[in-house]
Amino acid sequence: MLLGGALLLRLVLALVTDGYPYDMSCFVAWGDKLAAEGPAAFYSEGYFADYPPGYLWVLGLVGAIRAALHIAYESKWTYFLLALVPSLCDCGLAWLVYRTAKRSSRGVKEHTALVLTAFTAFNPLMLFDTGVWKQIDGAFALPLVLCFVLLEQRRYLPAAVLYGVALAIKPQALLFGPVLAVCYLAAITLEKDRLRAFGRCFGGAALALLPPLLTGLPFFGVVQLIPKLIDKYTGTMSGYPYATINAFNWLAALGGNWKGQADPALFGISWQQLGCLNILLVTAGLAYFAVRSVRGGWFSPLLLAAYYGIGIFTLAHCMHERYMVPGVLLTLLAAAHWNDIRLYAAGVGLSLTGFINLATVYSQTGTSDEWLTSATSSTVAVLTGLGETVCFVLLIFAVWDIARHGHTLALPETKPETAPPVPAPQPKWTRRELGA
């Protein structure tokens, strides 16, 4: 019932709102082109399509359904069809949170598991992203998050396949590549059969490449498959040379929104140099936490992925507003796994700052303040960026404590209310005493 209500709410929002216009026009146009011309003619010369082939198959199916039923672009049912798959994936993510909490060895109570599941199902960030904005981040995040859930269970090869599925959908999966590499390297030290674990690294890499290759083959053919895929992924990742692209993070708090990455930032260095330095620091932190947690027996792919995903969003350059979505969901999954109040707080805080971020960008689209240059929008960006950074710092404290010491801060237990004492039985009055 909980997940059914969450699905219904998303689909109702999809019907009564217009969606982010730039994404909507791309999704509809791509789906129509793929349905009409087929995959081999899709990436034609001069045609803008910055998505890899993975999710284009879903958009093509939407285009085919619209053509068969004569559904116009302006129809609300077009938005409904576009939001259907991501909405189902959002509900799958909420169910995954519940299953993770129930399987936790940290004593997550049924009430806590249900509350966390309800928050994930009705998360304001995900409701807005899927139901109003109508992006596909839920469909991208589900295989990516499930990959790290499987890594938590040491199911390395299925995890590699799911990472490949996420990579086939969006290039942003590459941001989590270092975490995947750390998990496979840690397996070499965690298992007795190190030769087998070492071979599994190569097997996992091959399996991770399989979904992008298979989904891209009809688009590019055998000869051009690998060169075209490399060009598609590198071109997409480098297509927005700005300090931050409406991402309310630490760089936005410093005034970097829509600033060219070559512009000066702090102490004479450019935004790009600052972002690269921050990426190195976050990656060094990932390596440190991984080594310490392996030695202590507290290695957790979910925890490391949450740290790295939010760390890159907070401190790196070229970030979009929605790049935080997988990191937020991973933080909620890590909270369900570790039952740590700091992780719960970070997940809730990041969800709220992400919602404010998306709502601000969406509300100003098509207005004179679309680039968020007004005093009000700039202030919102700075304050929200500071709030998001505070949530990341809280996340770091939790990761530091768990990775180094295996120490968690559980939710305070509420003592059950004790019933008032039953009064002692009173002596019965006799008729003689009553008449006295």
Regions from the language model: what does each represent?
Residues A72-W77, V97-P124, R154, P158, ...:
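Transmembrane-helix signature of polytopic, membrane-embedded enzymes
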Residues F176-L210, V222, P326:
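Perimembrane helix-loop-helix junctions
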Residues T117, F128, L144-L150, L157-A181, ...:
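Membrane-interface alpha helices of multi-pass inner-membrane proteins
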Residues D23-D50, G54, L61-A72, Q224-K232:
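Extracytosolic helix-loop segments that constitute the early lumenal/periplasmic catalytic or substrate-binding loops
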Residues R200, Q224, L229-I245, L251, ...:
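Transmembrane helical bundles and short interhelical boundary loops of multi-pass, membrane-embedded
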Residues M1-A29, E37, A83, S87-D90, ...:
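Transmembrane signal-anchor helices characteristic of membrane glycosylation enzymes that use polyprenol
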Residues C91-A94, R103, K232-T314, W400-G406, ...:
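Aromatic/glycine/proline-enriched transmembrane-helix motif characteristic
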Residues L96-R99, A139-Y156, L330-T331:
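Specific aromatic-rich, kink-prone transmembrane helix
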